UniProtKB/Swiss-Prot annotation:
It holds the Pfam family Cons_hypoth698. Signal peptide: none annotated. It is a multi-pass membrane protein. The chain crosses the membrane at residues 12-30, 35-54, 90-112, 122-144, 156-178, 210-232, 259-281, 316-338. Its main location: membrane. Keywords: Cell membrane, Membrane, Transmembrane, Transmembrane helix. Belongs to the UPF0324 family. One of its GO terms (cellular component) is plasma membrane. The keyword Membrane applies. It is found in: Cell membrane. It comes from Clostridium perfringens (strain 13 / Type A). This is UPF0324 membrane protein CPE0129. InterPro entries: UPF0324_pro.
């Protein structure tokens, strides 16, 4: 048993070490160029190095551990940065705005993906990534819908690139349409952008009050992650049971929630009721953020340039169309609910 663990650890270390180095460099570059962000640097450095200097199979176990296990741990610890009480801060209209916007984003993203000829599971991954919280949402949904690794890595890459573009674009829109009004600007950025880092980076163009309130809107979306995973898990189970019934078998599949989603929910509840001390919560948040960047480096290293060239242009069109739809939906809903 001990020898097996040592052997497994040795096989993981080379790839994990490269992902760690990429993550450290990406964090440094992200602070130097906050408009781009560490996540985008990590993914693209990973893609470049994984297809040039570090193509060897000896890095596979480490990159697989980074992109799967570290992302799962990141999702669990992310719960410490959330507080269910934040929902009350926005009131009914704010929560209703987020719920409707997320629903429209999921349905529209899935519809566009299928119309463009993408597979059902890739379209579901894009739906979750754009509607909820980018890489973490895709990582959460991927196992419950049994998505292919190639779909997962392409979806994460496209969602992060689209988010980076929107991060620059949204402050321009808010300045033109809302004259940088705090509430409306926060609702637009917090309701659309995929990651917390993108929300903060975009909101900083306007000011600290927008950073704080946009983050609250974003947190509500992340809290809804559990609901999205449950719904997607139910969809997958229904599809599997339909196949069994079609072959005259008794349906045997049940909804199974990944352990890290349960962990995320438990940590979120513990943080909301004040059991997790502030310093521990901040530590969890720091670890979660760094694990995610290392995971994104691993995801980048596992992207094959051939797959990216093959799917890239159409996938970027997909991401662009979804981004435009999100902006239209958000502007319309803000006009109704956020005044």
């Amino acid at each position: 048993m001990r020898n097996k663990i040592l052997k497994k650890s040795k096989s993981i270390l080379p790839g994990l070490f490269i992902c760690l180095i990429i993550g450290i460099i990406a964090e440094f570059l992200g602070k130097s160029f906050p408009t781009i962000g560490a996540a985008t640097f990590a993914i693209f450095m990973g893609i470049f190095l994984g297809n040039t200097l570090f193509k060897s199979d000896k890095y596979d176990e480490g990159t697989k551990f980074s992109e799967k296990d570290l992302l799962n741990y990141s999702i669990v610890l992310m719960g410490a940065s959330l507080n269910i009480i934040d929902i009350m801060a926005l009131g009914f209209n704010g929560v209703f705005y987020i719920a409707i916007l997320m629903t429209l984003t999921i349905c529209t993203t899935y519809f566009i993906g299928r119309k463009l000829g993408f597979g059902e599971k890739y379209s579901l991954l894009m739906s979750a990534g754009n509607a909820v919280c980018g890489s973490s949402a895709i990582g959460s949904v991927s196992p419950v819908i049994k998505a292919k690794d190639s779909d997962k890595v392409i979806a994460i890459t496209i969602v992060n690139v689209t988010g980076t573009i929107l991060m620059i674009l949204l402050p321009l829109i808010t300045s033109i349409l809302y004259n940088n009004d705090v509430l409306q600007s926060s609702a637009l950025m917090g309701g659309i952008l995929q990651s917390v880092g993108q929300v903060i980076g975009s909101a900083k163009f306007i000011g600290d009050p927008v950073v704080e309130l946009a983050t609250v809107f974003k947190i509500i979306r992340i809290i809804f992650l559990v609901v999205v995973v449950l719904v997607f898990a139910k969809i997958e189970v229904n599809e599997e049971n339909k196949e069994e019934i079609a072959h005259h078998h008794k349906p045997t599949h049940k909804v199974r929630i990944p352990w890290f989603i349960i962990g995320f929910f438990i940590i979120c509840i513990l943080n909301s009721i004040g059991i997790i001390p502030g310093i521990l919560g901040r530590t969890f948040k720091w670890i979660s953020s760094n694990f995610e960047i290392i995971a994104l480096a691993g995801i980048g290293m596992r992207v094959k340039i051939g797959d990216l060239v093959k799917e890239g242009p159409k996938a970027m069109l997909y991401g662009g169309l979804v981004g435009v739809c999100q902006i239209i939906f958000a502007l319309s809903l803000i006009n109704i609910f956020i005044k």
